[in-house]
């Protein structure tokens, strides 16, 4: 299963007018995967479709390597996970701050906070924002 997965997941381009069954199945799988991933996301968020779909297919194929005996999956390394997660996290935080600054800053203070706790909670929430990746 792990050896055939890259062959099944990634379609090969062809110059034919009509696709064969395997290429049609591959394109259907990738299209369906993208549809399922972005059904709950609004229309401006669909510009992330290519990046997130390719990232998910990459992670699936790397994790399928773990099915092979005596192999080590690269996703167990923290350096690979941080290398993939940190730029995406930073991009979403920066885009959120740029597009909706009041709502993004509003997440730094929970509703109903007593006045004496406001400075402390803003510092705590800011630290927790940067600890997330």
Swiss-Prot record:
The chain crosses the membrane at residues 48-68, 77-97, 111-131. SUPFAM superfamilies: F1F0 ATP synthase subunit A. It is found in: Mitochondrion inner membrane. One of its GO terms (molecular function) is proton-transporting ATP synthase activity, rotational mechanism. It catalyses: H(+)(in) = H(+)(out). It is a multi-pass membrane protein. Keywords: ATP synthesis, CF(0), Hydrogen ion transport, Ion transport, Membrane, Mitochondrion, Mitochondrion inner membrane, Transmembrane, Transmembrane helix, Transport. GO terms for cellular component: mitochondrial inner membrane; proton-transporting ATP synthase complex. InterPro entries: ATP_synth_F0_asu (IPR000568), ATP_synth_F0_asu_bact/mt (IPR045083), F0_ATP_A_sf (IPR035908). One of its GO terms (biological process) is proton transmembrane transport. Belongs to the ATPase A chain family. Component of the ATP synthase complex composed at least of ATP5F1A/subunit alpha, ATP5F1B/subunit beta, ATP5MC1/subunit c (homooctomer), MT-ATP6/subunit a, MT-ATP8/subunit 8, ATP5ME/subunit e, ATP5MF/subunit f, ATP5MG/subunit g, ATP5MK/subunit k, ATP5MJ/subunit j, ATP5F1C/subunit gamma, ATP5F1D/subunit delta, ATP5F1E/subunit epsilon, ATP5PF/subunit F6, ATP5PB/subunit b, ATP5PD/subunit d, ATP5PO/subunit OSCP. Subunit a, of the mitochondrial membrane ATP synthase complex (F(1)F(0) ATP synthase or Complex V) that produces ATP from ADP in the presence of a proton gradient across the membrane which is generated by electron transport complexes of the respiratory chain. ATP synthase complex consist of a soluble F(1) head domain - the catalytic core - and a membrane F(1) domain - the membrane proton channel. These two domains are linked by a central stalk rotating inside the F(1) region and a stationary peripheral stalk. This is ATP synthase F(0) complex subunit a.
């Amino acid at each position: 299963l792990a050896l055939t997965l890259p062959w099944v997941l990634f379609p090969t381009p062809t110059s034919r007018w009509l696709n064969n069954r395997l290429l049609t199945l591959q394109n259907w799988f990738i299209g369906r995967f993208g549809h399922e991933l972005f059904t709950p996301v609004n229309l401006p968020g669909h510009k992330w479709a290519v990046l997130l779909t390719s990232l998910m297919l990459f992670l699936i194929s790397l994790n399928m390597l773990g099915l092979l005996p005596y192999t080590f999956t690269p996703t167990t390394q923290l350096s690979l996970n941080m290398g993939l997660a940190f730029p995406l996290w930073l991009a979403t935080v920066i885009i959120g701050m740029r597009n909706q600054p009041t709502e993004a800053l509003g997440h730094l203070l929970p509703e109903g906070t007593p006045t004496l706790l406001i400075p402390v909670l803003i510092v705590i929430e800011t630290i927790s924002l940067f600890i997330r990746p």
